A protein has these predicted regions:
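N-terminal signal-anchor transmembrane alpha helix of single-pass membrane proteins
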Residues: 1-41
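Long, contiguous interaction/recruitment modules in multidomain scaffold/adaptor proteins
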Residues: 24-39, 143, 147-198, 203, ...
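Structural detector for internal amphipathic alpha-helices that build alpha-solenoid repeat scaffolds
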Residues: 85, 92-102, 124-134, 155-167, ...
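Eukaryotic acidic, Ser/Thr-rich intrinsically disordered low-complexity regions
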Residues: 333-397
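HEAT/HEAT-like alpha-solenoid repeats
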Residues: 138-139, 143-146, 182, 246, ...
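Amphipathic alpha-helical scaffolding segments comprising HEAT/armadillo-like alpha-solenoid repeats
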Residues: 99-115, 135-147, 167-179, 199-210, ...
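N-terminal topogenic membrane-targeting module
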Residues: 31-116
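Short inter-helical turns and helix N-cap capping residues of alpha-solenoid HEAT/ARM repeat scaffolds
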Residues: 118-119, 149-154, 182-184, 212-214, ...
């Protein structure tokens, strides 16, 4: 019979054997990786004259000639990787020439076949490479695979590749539909994916803003965040009354950003929206774009029941120069609402600390009223900035 000690020794030997086997596998993988990198470096050196030829003739109108002679699978991938690297760097006719070379070398066709592989990893790599080559020939098979695929990493790689390869807005529209149909949060990724395309997507985004699919509407609003044109105002005003609070929030933010088109009364009226998230977004946007006419509305918002609305209102007031800071001081002294007073004091404290930190810079601005001097007008002489912690703060949620 085996004793407990024998069993323990046997167990230790088994563990050591497994550890040794695992270390051996890791060493083999590392060695294989080193060998592969050396082979790739050697092949890059071998085909350097061809790469020089491509660089010298990149601006010529004539198409590139494919490499002469048969290529091994590894040689094909090495050249393909170099071409994909250049495709990302170039634009216009130069990019089109490099993409045409990929098609002439049957690289696009090779990866199109890999899309139907039974192995997930091969599909992923093929989708990535097709996007890197930006060939219009890859759009249809990529979209077909998107229609079959469930939500996951491959779906997002396929969507990004479609965006890179698409030649028509209809193709991008189908891609957006397939990307956002699985999960509500995918509209965030969809808006980011659209940045990969070389097409002008503004007409597509305007179309999506009228769509019944809320995810497509959100995608369009996120993708249009940097635009404040007058042409968007009618659609945004309609979406500002949407039942979906996320759509309403995004639309209101964009309208506030384009505040020169709308009366300030309209903007400030959104501070009474039933959704606290939207009221907070409006309060935040008012400060970012410096609408001093909204100071009374922001002061009133300091009494809001939502902590984030009070926080962004106080922060926005602090961003509106002397007038905003005076309003904060007045709110801090008023006793009608403790939440308003505490939030105002908390923001005053942060602003004074910030001014103290940048004191040397502020001294260079001649004639400017510092927030410290305004503070002293309302609260008297402060002994030192670090001791201002005693003025309190709003910590209610």
């Amino acid at each position: 019979m085996f004793s407990n000690l024998d069993l323990a020794v046997a167990f230790i030997y088994v563990c050591l054997g497994l550890i040794g086997f695992g270390v051996l596998i890791l060493l083999m993988m590392k060695a294989r990786s080193i060998i592969l990198e050396r082979k790739r470096a050697a092949l890059l050196e071998k085909h350097q004259p061809y790469f020089v030829y491509l660089q010298r003739h990149i601006v010529d109108p004539d198409p590139f000639q494919p490499p002469k002679g048969p290529l091994s699978p590894l040689e094909t991938r090495v050249i393909q990787d170099k071409l994909m690297e250049w495709i990302e760097k170039f634009r216009g006719a130069q990019r089109q020439k490099l993409t045409a070379l990929c098609e002439d070398m049957d690289l696009v066709q090779l990866d199109r076949k890999q899309l139907s592989s039974m192995f997930y990893a091969k599909q992923m790599k093929a989708a990535y490479r097709l996007g890197g080559m930006r060939s219009a020939q890859a759009v249809e098979p990529l979209i077909e695979l998107m229609k079959q695929e469930k939500d996951g990493p491959l779906l997002h790689v396929l969507a990004r590749s479609v965006a890179k390869c698409a030649e028509h807005l209809d193709q991008l529209y189908v891609m957006l539909q397939q990307l956002t149909r699985h999960r509500k949060g995918n509209y965030l990724n969809a808006a980011e994916v659209l940045e990969e395309t070389s097409l002008d997507v503004t007409p597509l985004l305007l179309q999506c803003m009228e769509d019944r699919d809320h995810n497509l509407v959100k995608t369009a609003l996120l993708a249009l965040r940097g635009q404040t044109g007058v042409t968007l105002t009618p659609a945004l005003l309609r979406l500002a009354d949407s039942d979906d609070k996320e759509i309403r929030s995004l639309a209101v933010k964009m309208l506030v950003r384009a505040g020169n088109i709308l009366p300030e009364e309209t903007i400030c009226s959104w501070l009474t929206d039933p959704e606290g998230e939207i009221r907070a977004a409006v309060a935040e946007s008012l400060g970012q774009f410096g609408y001093e006419g909204s100071i009374p509305a922001l002061k009133q918002a300091l009494t809001d029941s939502d902590w984030w609305v009070r926080y962004h209102s106080a922060k926005s007031l602090a961003m509106m120069g002397d007038a905003g800071f005076r309003t904060l001081c007045e709110a801090a002294l008023e006793r009608d609402d403790p939440f308003k007073s505490d939030m105002a004091k908390d923001r005053i404290h942060e602003e004074l600390l910030r001014e103290h930190f940048f004191a040397n810079r502020r001294k260079q601005i001649s004639g400017a009223h510092t927030k410290q001097s305004l503070y002293e007008q309302y609260f008297g002489q402060a002994s030192s900035v670090p001791n201002i912690r005693g003025i309190g703060g709003d910590y209610s949620a």
